[in-house]
């Protein structure tokens, strides 16, 4: 079993987006710690299994971040289940999890399931609109969410998601200072080695996604953060 606490860098692939064989090979051979498959729009059983089968040729951990029940399937090393803490719709707190347990509860290996305390911070992102997230958050709000995740819910991961824009470093720093047990994931707008280095100095793990589809060379440079210690 892989130890996710050792992961510093994850590439996130969207099953609804095209990636060439050459670019996928470069991503999977880049020394990233893991590949995560996940997205908001058009995540289907067919495109998830197609992308999974392409990535499975490489010897690295493979994660499915669950956005709907229809695209859940066996074959992944881990299943990340987001609970969107700042959603105004209870479905995105535990509704998806409830349906997953009703459908697959009898066969789930809970050692493979990682629950993420998700906080969506970009009001203009698809994920914010889809999850009906209240993104008007102060530093104090984020600190309270961090305390909730770390001390009360005791979730293994807190994911600060800016989805498409580079986040407020001071707010991410404030969150990190309240997490003593929970692993901090950061994702959103990382498009350069400098940004990757800046966020990797704060977060335990950075997630790099959109830049893969815009500039593969810049995406690959973000893996260099693994050469330095946090």
Swiss-Prot record:
Coiled coil stretches, renumbered: none
Alphabetical keyword list: Lipid biosynthesis, Lipid metabolism, Magnesium, Metal-binding, Phospholipid biosynthesis, Phospholipid metabolism, Transferase
InterPro entries: GGGP/HepGP_synthase_I (IPR039074), GGGP/HepGP_synthase_sf (IPR038597), GGGP_HepGP_synthase (IPR008205)
Binding-site residues, Mg(2+): 14, 40
Residues at which sn-glycerol 1-phosphate binds: 12, 159-164, 189, 209-210
EC number: 2.5.1.n9
GO molecular function terms attached to this record: heptaprenylglyceryl phosphate synthase activity; magnesium ion binding; prenyltransferase activity
UniProt keyword NADP, yes or no: no
Catalytic activity: sn-glycerol 1-phosphate + all-trans-heptaprenyl diphosphate = 3-heptaprenyl-sn-glycero-1-phosphate + diphosphate
Keyword Lipid metabolism found: yes
GO biological process, one term: glycerophospholipid biosynthetic process
Pathway: Membrane lipid metabolism; glycerophospholipid metabolism
Co-factor requirement: Mg(2+)
UniProt record similarity statement: Belongs to the GGGP/HepGP synthase family. Group I subfamily.
Subunit structure: Homodimer.
Functional description taken from the UniProt entry: Prenyltransferase that catalyzes in vivo the transfer of the heptaprenyl moiety of heptaprenyl pyrophosphate (HepPP; 35 carbon atoms) to the C3 hydroxyl of sn-glycerol-1-phosphate (G1P), producing heptaprenylglyceryl phosphate (HepGP). This reaction is an ether-bond-formation step in the biosynthesis of archaea-type G1P-based membrane lipids found in Bacillales. To a much lesser extent, is also able to use geranylgeranyl diphosphate (GGPP; C20) as the prenyl donor.
Name of the molecule in the record: Heptaprenylglyceryl phosphate synthase
Organism: Staphylococcus aureus (strain NCTC 8325 / PS 47)
Lineage: Bacteria, Bacillati, Bacillota, Bacilli, Bacillales
């Amino acid at each position: 079993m892989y130890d996710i606490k050792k992961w510093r860098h994850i590439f996130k692939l969207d099953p609804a987006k095209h990636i060439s064989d050459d670019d996928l090979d470069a991503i999977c051979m880049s020394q990233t710690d893991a590949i995560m498959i996940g997205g908001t729009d058009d995540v289907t059983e067919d495109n998830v299994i197609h992308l999974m089968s392409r990535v499975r040729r490489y010897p690295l951990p493979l994660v499915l971040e669950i956005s709907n029940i229809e695209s859940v399937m066996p074959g992944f090393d881990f299943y990340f289940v987001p609970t969107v803490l700042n959603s105004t719709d209870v479905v995105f707190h535990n509704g998806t999890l409830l349906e997953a347990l009703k459908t697959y509860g009898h066969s789930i290996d809970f050692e493979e399931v990682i629950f993420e305390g998700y906080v969506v911070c970009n009001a203009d992102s698809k994920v914010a609109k889809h999850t009906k997230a209240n993104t008007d958050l102060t530093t104090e709000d984020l600190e309270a969410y961090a305390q909730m995740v770390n001390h009360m819910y005791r979730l293994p991961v807190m994911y600060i998601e800016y989805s498409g824009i580079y986040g407020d470093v001071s707010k991410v720093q404030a969150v990190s200072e309240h997490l003593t047990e929970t692993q901090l994931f950061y994702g959103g707008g990382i498009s350069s080695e400098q940004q990757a280095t800046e966020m990797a100095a704060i977060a335990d793990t950075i997630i790099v996604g959109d830049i893969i589809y815009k500039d593969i060379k810049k995406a690959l440079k973000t893996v260099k953060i693994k050469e330095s210690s946090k």
